Amino acid sequence: FFLAGALLPGWRPLAGLLGLAAVIDYVAITFGGVSAFCVSPAYVALAPAYGALYAAGHWYARGHRAELSTLPRFAAAALAGTAVCELVSSGAFYAFSGRFADPTLAEFGTRLARYFPLALEGMALYLGAAAIAAAAFMAIGPRRATHAHG
């Protein structure tokens, strides 16, 4: 959702992406044998959680240039989007899923400390792969243009 926010124009694509995510979850659970543990009354909180990632990507895109000087903005946007997404999605799941007998703020803090690094790791892998792909396309792009007109 972060990359979609950075690459797609406006906010309209977000609704389609949220629908696609729900369909993917449904298919994975119904036909792929994936556990339905996370599907609960808190599932609806994924919309604002993913929306936060989309918004962070959208904010980054407004100041993007293909220069290393935009790397701090990129990192700040990715970190902020991931943090808000994790707080909203995990917080809602912890508070509203019905999976925890006696939810407390202290226990949520312990769980957040355990799972937030995994969210950062996942985001870093996705964004690292996207950065490598973008660098490869940028390196190949000028060569193709030269050969096409040469």
Residue ranges and their predicted role:
Residues 31-34, 56-60, 72-73:
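Non-catalytic terminal and connector segments of soluble metabolic enzymes
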Residues 63-150:
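Membrane-embedded alpha-helical hairpins and interfacial helices in multi-pass inner-membrane proteins
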